[in-house]
């Protein structure tokens, strides 16, 4: 019979970094509230949570890389909102942020949860920041907890 390794949803004793973009703060602050709520509900001590605020989504990967390099965090949660406008700027930012965050996780071995919304409209972002479609900040924190525990089981 194979051995199954799964992460549990218990944040006790784990240390988390959160990187949140300030641009579109009316959305990103709701995502941050959701992430903090999930971490605390699942047993994290608020003294084991560090929040780094960066100007916008484009700065998220580099701040995440700096946090990962410290070796202090069991997982890092990236939060922000990139909303499509009338120019191709959205496409460049959304693609580079997602690639950059993925590279940090792969290169560092630290679990990184991607909670950066990439939406076509403000309404879609609002729906995903605590209204009709739930709170993706909360969901990202749950992913971070589970993955951090999974990695502890693999060691």
From Swiss-Prot:
Its signal peptide is: none
Listed A to Z, the keywords are: Riboflavin biosynthesis, Transferase
Q: Which GO terms describe its biological process?
A: riboflavin biosynthetic process
The lineage's top-level taxon is Bacteria
Which EC number(s) does the record attach to this protein? Answer: 2.5.1.78
Annotated (2S)-2-hydroxy-3-oxobutyl phosphate binding lies at 86-87, 128
Task: Tell me the residue numbers annotated for binding 5-amino-6-(D-ribitylamino)uracil.
Answer: 23, 57-59, 81-83, 114
Q: Which residues form the active site?
A: 89
Q: In which pathway does it act?
A: Cofactor biosynthesis; riboflavin biosynthesis; riboflavin from 2-hydroxy-3-oxobutyl phosphate and 5-amino-6-(D-ribitylamino)uracil: step 1/2
Q: Note one Pfam family from the annotation.
A: DMRL_synthase
Cellular component aspect of the GO annotation: cytosol; riboflavin synthase complex
Q: Which EC main class describes this enzyme?
A: transferase
Transferase found in the keyword field:
yes
A GO molecular function term, named singly, is: 6,7-dimethyl-8-ribityllumazine synthase activity
Q: Which NCBIfam families match?
A: lumazine-synth, PRK00061.1-4
Family membership:
Belongs to the DMRL synthase family.
What is the recorded function of this protein according to its Swiss-Prot or TrEMBL entry? Answer: Catalyzes the formation of 6,7-dimethyl-8-ribityllumazine by condensation of 5-amino-6-(D-ribitylamino)uracil with 3,4-dihydroxy-2-butanone 4-phosphate. This is the penultimate step in the biosynthesis of riboflavin.
The name this protein carries in UniProt is 6,7-dimethyl-8-ribityllumazine synthase
């Amino acid at each position: 019979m194979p051995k199954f390794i799964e992460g549990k949803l218990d944040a006790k004793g784990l240390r988390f970094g959160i990187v949140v973009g300030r641009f579109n703060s009316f959305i990103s602050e709701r995502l941050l509230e959701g992430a903090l709520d999930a971490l605390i509900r699942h047993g994290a001590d608020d003294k084991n949570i560090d929040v780094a605020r960066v100007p916008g989504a484009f700065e998220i990967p580099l701040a995440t890389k700096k946090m990962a390099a410290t070796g202090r965090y069991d997982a890092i949660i990236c939060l922000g909102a990139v909303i499509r406008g009338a120019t191709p700027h959205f496409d460049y930012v959304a693609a580079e942020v997602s690639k950059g965050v993925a590279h940090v996780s792969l290169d560092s071995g630290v679990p990184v949860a991607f909670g950066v919304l990439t939406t076509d409209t403000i309404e879609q972002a609002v729906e995903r920041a605590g209204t009709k479609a739930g709170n993706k900040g909360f969901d990202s924190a749950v992913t971070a907890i589970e993955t951090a525990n999974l990695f502890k089981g693999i060691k």
